[in-house]
Amino acid sequence: MTEPAQKKQKQTVQERKAFISRITNETKIQIAISLNGGYIQIKDSILPAKKDDDVASQATQSQVIDIHTGVGFLDHMIHALAKHSGWSLIVECIGDLHIDDHHTTEDCGIALGQAFKEAMGAVRGVKRFGTGFAPLDEALSRAVVDLSNRPFAVIDLGLKREMIGDLSTEMIPHFLESFAEAARITLHVDCLRGFNDHHRSESAFKALAVAIREAISSNGTNDVPSTKGVLM
């Protein structure tokens, strides 16, 4: 490998940023992400106006998070995922919520997975595997991640309510499945205990965040973490 190529590869790993625009007849989505945190922005917002009372937004020197999917509980979950993964993340979505929450939730999962994959770039110099546990009061969840380029998801949250806020509970595992498929990762998430479905869901997203944060962290080398010598 030439010296310029090496420098370019190191720069890409260092930045780990991406911007995704995904437009269909059902949803319009823009996502900006930095896996390393720090400052990000979307210059041309697709949102007609932003509310002043957003609860899925925060900005510090280390992270910028601003989530607007049109589905409040989905915003809350993506916010938790970004916060505890150490990402900076902006999500804007205009979806056909007059139908239901399916297209918006699924497409946000797909677009986030695409953004993650693009920001991650070559799986090199990272741990690849990550495991996370996270409690929320009585609820406890576990997540295991493999940056394998083998998309697969096993999700068992044991949710019993039909809705949490304005989000159908059936769409919560489907969001995670859509994310895993588009990100091309293997993902196992299960809630081990808990009786409050809000707590079960939130602990699952936080556990996933902990697992992803470990998986994308440096392993101290510039090697591909695979016996194949390649993950692509």
Swiss-Prot record:
It comes from the Eukaryota. Keywords: Amino-acid biosynthesis, Histidine biosynthesis, Lyase. One of its GO terms (molecular function) is imidazoleglycerol-phosphate dehydratase activity. SUPFAM superfamilies: Ribosomal protein S5 domain 2-like. It is an enzyme of class 4 (lyase). The keyword Calcium does not apply. Pathway: Amino-acid biosynthesis; L-histidine biosynthesis; L-histidine from 5-phospho-alpha-D-ribose 1-diphosphate: step 6/9. The keyword Ligase does not apply. GO terms for biological process: L-histidine biosynthetic process. Its EC number is 4.2.1.19. Coiled coil: none annotated. Gene3D superfamilies: Imidazole glycerol phosphate dehydratase, domain 1. It catalyses: D-erythro-1-(imidazol-4-yl)glycerol 3-phosphate = 3-(imidazol-4-yl)-2-oxopropyl phosphate + H2O. Belongs to the imidazoleglycerol-phosphate dehydratase family. This is Imidazoleglycerol-phosphate dehydratase. It comes from Lachancea kluyveri (strain ATCC 58438 / CBS 3082 / BCRC 21498 / NBRC 1685 / JCM 7257 / NCYC 543 / NRRL Y-12651). The lineage of its organism: Eukaryota, Fungi, Dikarya, Ascomycota, Saccharomycotina. The gene is HIS3.
